[in-house]
Amino acid sequence: MEQQFDYFTVTSLLVFLTFLLRLVWGWKKSSDKIKIRLPPGPSKLPIIGSLHHLIGLDVDLPYYALTDLANKYGPLMHLQLGKMSLVVASSAKMFKELMKENDLAISQRPVPYVARVLEDAGRDIAFVPYGDYWRQIRKISRMELFSVKKVQSLHYIREDQSSKLVESIRGHAGTVMNLSKAVSDYTSTVVARAAFGSGCKDQDKFIRLSLEMVAAAGAVSTLPDMFPALGFIPILSGKKAFLKSIQTEADKILDVIIDEHIQKTKSNEYDGKESDKEDIVDVLLRLEKSGELEIPITTQDIKAVIWSVFAGGTDTSSTTTLWTMSELMRNPKVMEKVQAEIREKLKGKKEIYESDIQDLHYMRAVIKEALRLRIPGPLLLPRETMEPIEVDGYVIPERTKILFNAWAVTRDPQLWENPESFIPERFIENPLDYKGTNYEFTPFGSGRRICPGMNFGIANVELPLAKLLYFFNWQLPPGMQPHELDMTAKFGVVCGRKNDLFLIPTPYNNIP
């Protein structure tokens, strides 16, 4: 009887303790919820959240709509978009608090639905989850793939392809030509040669597929990110299948490229030692062969890196070059000034090399101003909180998406005089740079998730732009005035011109 009593006593005690622990846990969770204090934002409706407030705003260019809402609700704003809890930062002060003070806590990057469709989601440079593999791929990117030394070592590719670009434009002298296509072809080929060399017989096909991939990804609905139950929409529309078919076809080409590189190392054509002319596949295979990596690199990892390079390096550089040329055509005095600098510094040269353009300070100011006024990624890439964070007196819970409206910051009249005007002089003798420490100017992001290919991207702009402005004078199509040039943007993975840029090149005659 005593044993039975002890049994029930112990059992009752365990039940009571379990109940007590649950009560305490429930109180703790409730207490945590009470502590949450989200930033202000528009009112919410059941199911759709704040989506109805975007109706009537410019949803084709969402950074416009978000800027309008931020003007009403403040520089740190909360939106509930279906299931997605989103905080939008729209000031340099909020950028600094998030990207500097809370950088570690928001080092996670949410993987969008369109990336999850692809097999390499979570292994590429852009969307790899925060953790050991992210640390490894970031170190490889900074120290091997996109270091200043590595980018400089690829000068021969940019010099070769930019010379071909000049010759191509000479063939259109005096006629209206599609400069958008010419610049896109240049950038795509430079990225391809940097990624896997110049001996790929299917290079042009892969470039075409990569451009189709970016366009197809931009066309996939974002609704499944806000309403996961609507994931069937891209399936029924055929867009998911189309995206997968492009990836499958391109992957076959990458399989051949990687295998050829492996065979090259086995046949001693490449000795496995670091070389100035290593392409990205060479570098990754060398690192894998060295045995020094904590996490082995697979073929899928190499493919994911190549896709990242194409997605991040091709459109961003060509878009920046084309927006720069567009602004120069709209501002003839700036065009005259930058051409005068280039032609004075490079006077008498029949060919231009990267070593020749290091002192073109005004041209670099022109590029910076184009990046400010026509930022390629106006909303940057989103982050996600890994734990509750406090920002400006508000408490933002774990797993909240963080969006950075860089477009609003670079147009902020409190930070920039005449922010809507193209004035490169604002960057002359000004330490303001795009490398992530000036939060009013972050075209490549900041902190742990800053774009690792920044140096590579800028290098792919500077040399071709210098050659375009040195070797040619440029005119708008007949009958068009500078203020009539269409500057409409198209939102996507990169925010470029909606319509191609057509100009008339005339060879500059004062070159011996």
UniProtKB/Swiss-Prot annotation:
Intracellular or extracellular location(s): Membrane
Residues that coordinate or bind heme: C451
Tissue: Accumulates in mature fruits and in juice vesicles.
The protein's Enzyme Commission number: 1.14.14.-
GO molecular function, one term: heme binding
Protein name according to UniProt: Dihydroniloticin synthase CYP71CD1
EC class of the enzyme, as a word: oxidoreductase
Record's catalysed reaction(s): tirucalla-7,24-dien-3beta-ol + 2 reduced [NADPH--hemoprotein reductase] + 2 O2 = dihydroniloticin + 2 oxidized [NADPH--hemoprotein reductase] + 2 H2O + 2 H(+)
GO cellular component, one term: membrane
Pathway(s) served: Secondary metabolite biosynthesis; terpenoid biosynthesis
Membrane-spanning segments: 7-27
Taxonomic source organism: Citrus sinensis
Role noted for this protein: Monooxygenase involved in the biosynthesis of limonoids triterpene natural products such as limonin, a compound with insecticidal activity responsible for the bitter taste in citrus. Catalyzes the conversion of tirucalladienol to dihydroniloticin.
Gene label: CYP71CD1
UniProt membrane topology term: Single-pass membrane protein
Family annotation (InterPro entries): Cyt_P450, Cyt_P450_CS, Cyt_P450_E_grp-I, Cyt_P450_sf
Cofactor: heme
Keyword vocabulary terms for this entry: Heme, Iron, Membrane, Metal-binding, Monooxygenase, Oxidoreductase, Transmembrane, Transmembrane helix
Family recorded in the similarity comment: Belongs to the cytochrome P450 family.
